[in-house]
């Protein structure tokens, strides 16, 4: 599935990361022999006290939360996931030291790839110091099998770099004495996406910096291997990716910018494997292609209001003049994804009530569309990649929410039958008494902004509850609402969790993003303010018990709100925060400046854009006043968010607070806010992929929140009430 992910991913200030639960599985598996990773922690200092000293005040509580989090992850270590890859005769899976496979008829497993052997090639990266070599830890990102299971290709990533390495393994018959065991036959560096067209032909894209612009073809023959160039994109704001259709008969070359799409097709059933164009790019046209029989099923924003609808075109005449509408969703319903399952198109959609549903459209009788209701708490849908040998007419997926662990479901589109993996529709462990409330806040311009609130007691009983508010609002991307054990822990300790779906994101369709792009960016800040006011008006928590959390571009509305209304929250945690919008967009030499102009604007070439950015940029609007306490976590090698901007923001913020307290010693700014900068090594934009390091980072955030909000540490399960520390306002 993941049809729209390529349209959203591009090279934005966001990434798709390995599931944290998956990281835990890698830790507890019996074959764990990960290469050791030594990570140095670097802390900057200010004029009075270093951030390292600031961090010391959280250490004891951090150790406590690390133990609690590890126990929570252990509890969920056996929940279902879709990480295994099913071939015709084998199931492939990742365990600590490599990739393994198991014959579906036997229980014995065989190693296909040893990650330790891959790590012996650091010389390609110029690393010659033994201590530095020990910092390399390979994690498997993606696995692809060739059609007849002759070859396996996998991309691997290290903590120190965004670049991926693709390893091609020739597979033999399992445990056969007559054939060679699985062994590496080819290695490619800087590979981002890759798909097999045949057993001997692999198409792939390469990542240069943060941009994919070239497609190559690798031919594996008995004599020698050959690499040829297939496609090169010349537009600097276009990101290129290769994707295989569900039925494996069409390989697409997707060329997407923020506002345009262009798709080339390769028919894998033909011998020449030459790409041909579907529809030339044109401004504000977005589309994605799937395959059904000899037709193309296209998800395109040609519907009312330039929203997504489903159209059809013959494979022989794929251009826009041949597009015929199959299905248009009703007003207020936003299509989030599409899949083709035999003779049906399955759409993931969000209703006007902000609930996720499945819409099934018969491709033989398009007017016979029907809607499949899911549990009301559903906030995320994770489809399973179809098995190679699976010809069933079934769509398998997992549903979850930040506090509900994944539950497996099977949909049989032809019969309209929906089955859960458990009898009662819950996950194997008890989901608990967790309430999901969907709210709407009125912005000053009359726009209704959705809020998803998770809580364990009725809303009227949340007055004294601490509140953690999540926000993003950029690139048309929805807030990440997959299951997270940390959120479950907070909820069980009496917290309320709010997810504010502000404009700039994609929760209410493409227009939701368009309203808060470039000159409309202030609307996202106003939406966040409206959400907080609405929650407080309902009696949910209070400013002194409220914390905001965001990552990457989500730091922009949070930072802007802190400048305008710092008394609306007591604490903030930011991860890999994008805070210097003006400085970044003024510098075309930075990796994402040119690509991001359609999102943030061009302050160099357009005076209006410069004025707009200057009005909300978190760094350039810092003023002497009483700010909330802020924990900033940044990564020294992060190329998406320049570290210089985070350092400059931290320094100026501390100076502004110091100036304010000096000017007004009797001000209400007591206790003084703590501005803590935690700089970690590595290039992972959204944090370490090492489980232990991830636990330390998350435990520090929890320790920071409890300390700055003046909360007692969590009590045992029978004493969950959170009490304010005496003497702290």
Positions of predicted regions on the chain:
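Generic beta-strand/beta-sheet core signal
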Residues: 169, 205, 254, 266, ...
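Flexible loop/turn segments at secondary-structure boundaries
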Residues: 211, 237, 259-261, 272, ...
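Structured, non-catalytic alpha/beta "coupling" segments that mediate domain-domain communication
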Residues: 80-81, 88-97, 296-297, 391-423
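Beta-propeller folds
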Residues: 2-361, 480, 484, 681-684, ...
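Conserved blade-ending motifs and adjacent loop-strand segments that build the rim/top face
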Residues: 276-288, 323-336, 369-385, 422-432
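Active-site-proximal cap/loop segments of hydrolase catalytic domains
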Residues: 502-729
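Cap/lid segment of the alpha/beta-hydrolase catalytic domain
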Residues: 129-134, 423-547, 551, 556-557, ...
